[in-house]
């Protein structure tokens, strides 16, 4: 604990969008103290050189990644790094007694062969990976509370799984008919310069990418299979939309009981998420918009039934950088520490 009685926290990979969102949340959190910011590319520079708008709020330098120094100063470490790097850091930090929350894909999979197949990296940390808990609180709240290592979900899986989970868990749909059409703002691509994310390329344009082979597909399928109790495959197609942040996922699936109506499903969803303060089930005939979630840790869900086709349509909207990434990680930490899971997290959107 710090001299103020707060829990000291560090971020490795603080220079990206995920890192700066964490900084914002941790600075405002009543029980946490930002004690370390790490990153190789920006080491030695004041953090405010990277983000000048934080002048007067953050006075830390970005430091080289030194695991012994991090463990000596931090009780909790967020790893906000590209895929494939956390596996080299997490085991040592855990051995030194730190709680670790990994925002990459490295600790999301129960089967490491699935990770290797989709991410191309062989793993030597099977024992550590087996201790990781998938960090979606609405499904695994109790397990998260007891964990030392959290594999925080991806942004698309968060929006998709919150829309799908009640249907899968209660056997309301034919699982193999599930289709996920999801659209994300450009911040999901990170802060590095990429041609397709340039204003001149993205503005006024909408397009799909990684069709049929996006890396978030097996992550979604793993959790759907866990909920359904058998192997499930889904069709997932992501799209890039010309706005900075937000995800809208629209899920389609065939109902097992074509007699189910919208009000039936609204009742089921409200019951399923009754203890989930960050999920808002919208009234009948109201469908979510990304702007409502912008800057918050909320997920808005709307539901419709097409009686003509026998399909249910579920729409979910989140902020990809908060509920889809950093906000959800802090939500998990709140549970790990025994605090209210809403603590220190924004509930009101930037609007308009």
Swiss-Prot record:
**Might you give the EC number(s) for this enzyme?**
1.2.1.38
Name any GO cellular component annotation: cytoplasm
UniProt xrefs under InterPro entries: AGPR_AS, AGPR_type-1, NAD(P)-bd_dom_sf, NAGSA_dehydrogenase, Semialdehyde_DH_NAD-bd
Task: Fetch the CDD domains from UniProt.
Answer: AGPR_1_C, AGPR_1_N
Spell out the Pfam families in the cross-references.
Answer: Semialdhyde_dh (PF01118), Semialdhyde_dhC_1 (PF22698)
Pathway noted in the entry: Amino-acid biosynthesis; L-arginine biosynthesis; N(2)-acetyl-L-ornithine from L-glutamate: step 3/4
Compartment(s) where it occurs, according to its Swiss-Prot or TrEMBL record: Cytoplasm
Gene Ontology biological process terms in this record: L-arginine biosynthetic process
User: Can you tell which superkingdom this protein's organism belongs to?
Assistant: Bacteria
Q: Where is the active site?
A: 155
Q: Which UniProt keywords apply?
A: Amino-acid biosynthesis, Arginine biosynthesis, Cytoplasm, NADP, Oxidoreductase
Molecular function as annotated in GO: N-acetyl-gamma-glutamyl-phosphate reductase activity; NAD binding; NADP+ binding
**Coiled-coil region(s) at which residues?**
none
Q: Mind telling me which SMART domains this protein's record contains?
A: Semialdhyde_dh
> Where mainly located?
cytoplasm
Leading EC class: oxidoreductase
Q: Which reaction does it catalyse?
A: N-acetyl-L-glutamate 5-semialdehyde + phosphate + NADP(+) = N-acetyl-L-glutamyl 5-phosphate + NADPH + H(+)
Family the UniProt entry places it in: Belongs to the NAGSA dehydrogenase family. Type 1 subfamily.
Question: What function does the entry list?
Answer: Catalyzes the NADPH-dependent reduction of N-acetyl-5-glutamyl phosphate to yield N-acetyl-L-glutamate 5-semialdehyde.
PANTHER family on file: N-ACETYL-GAMMA-GLUTAMYL-PHOSPHATE REDUCTASE, CHLOROPLASTIC-RELATED, N-ACETYL-GAMMA-GLUTAMYL-PHOSPHATE REDUCTASE, CHLOROPLASTIC-RELATED-RELATED
Annotated protein name in UniProt = N-acetyl-gamma-glutamyl-phosphate reductase
Species name: Cyanothece sp. (strain PCC 7425 / ATCC 29141)
Q: What is the lineage of its organism?
A: Bacteria, Bacillati, Cyanobacteriota, Cyanophyceae, Gomontiellales
